[in-house]
């Protein structure tokens, strides 16, 4: 059997970085994709040091929809067995939509939605042909609710949830599984392109704990994964209550966190 590879976007930090270590620790060679080439090289070196796997880094700005064209074109001619695709890349924009920069919002859609679509479409034919493969889309508990002052971010996460659920059904008889991972607040640096800089959360699950759950549940073939009791409670309420009520609740919570 050929050696298995995992492709991970947003692999330079946070959950993506932790997922790189998880898949490398599981014996997967890894292709790591993100903008920060220096950080990617450090993650790749650590994967090799810890687990002895092969690594490849692809420095690309996924807000440019053509950034991965060369990489995608090469996929069809490679003999590598890409068993896992992790669509994790993303960033956030905080602020009322009418005041935020439209180009930044479009970049957000490109990073979180367009790149996931392009990569998923690129790897699926070979996975279907082998009757084996896993797609992991990293969404959010915000996939289930409207989020004032993060409207485009939450809409992108909702897209990933809906897309993943439809794709899982389409692929039911193929042996390819689709997992959508919906974490809440994690203890990780969150970089915004909206002028708020970086802020480190002090509460919530660690990126490492979240990644461990995502890794295990992906390989088990679980479809929707919401880690943690509080997050599952939020999702339950978001599905039970009217959208207007949920939006007001989320607005209040974010204000308490100093986000608005």
Spans of model-derived segments:
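Conserved glycine-rich cofactor-binding loop
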Residues: 10-13
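Conserved NAD(P)H cofactor-binding loop of Rossmann-fold oxidoreductase domains
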Residues: 88-93
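Substrate-binding pocket helix/loop in short-chain dehydrogenase/reductase
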Residues: 96-98, 104-109
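SDR active-site lid
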Residues: 168, 172-233, 240, 244
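Conserved glycine-rich Rossmann-like NAD(P)H-binding loop of the short-chain dehydrogenase/reductase
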Residues: 26-42
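Residue(s) in the substrate-gating loop at a strand-loop-helix junction
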Residues: 140
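Active-site helix of classical SDR
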Residues: 120, 156
């Amino acid at each position: 059997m050929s050696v298995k590879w995992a492709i991970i976007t947003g692999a330079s930090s946070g959950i993506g970085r932790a997922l790189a270590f998880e898949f490398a620790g599981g014996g997967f060679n890894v292709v790591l994709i993100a903008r920060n080439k220096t950080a990617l090289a450090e993650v790749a070196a650590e994967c090799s040091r810890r687990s002895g796997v092969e690594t490849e880094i692809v420095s690309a700005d996924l807000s440019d929809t053509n950034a991965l064209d060369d990489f995608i074109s090469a996929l069809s001619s490679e003999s590598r067995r890409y068993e896992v695709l992790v669509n994790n890349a993303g960033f956030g924009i905080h602020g009322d939509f009418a005041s935020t920069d439209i180009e930044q919002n479009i970049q957000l859609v490109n990073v979180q939605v367009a790149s996931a679509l392009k990569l998923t479409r690129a790897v699926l034919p070979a996975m279907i042909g082998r009757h084996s493969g896993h797609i992991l889309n990293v969404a959010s508990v915000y996939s289930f609710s409207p989020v004032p002052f993060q409207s485009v971010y939450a809409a992108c996460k909702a897209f990933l949830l809906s897309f993943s659920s439809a794709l899982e059904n389409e692929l039911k008889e193929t042996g390819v599984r689709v997992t959508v991972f919906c974490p809440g607040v994690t203890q990780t640096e969150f970089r915004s392109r909206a002028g708020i800089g970086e802020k480190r959360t002090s509460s919530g699950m660690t990126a490492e704990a979240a990644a461990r759950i995502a890794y295990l549940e992906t390989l088990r073939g679980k479809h929707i994964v919401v880690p943690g009791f509080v997050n599952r409670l939020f999702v339950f309420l978001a599905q039970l209550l009217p959208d207007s009520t949920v939006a007001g609740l989320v607005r209040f919570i974010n204000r308490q966190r100093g986000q608005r």
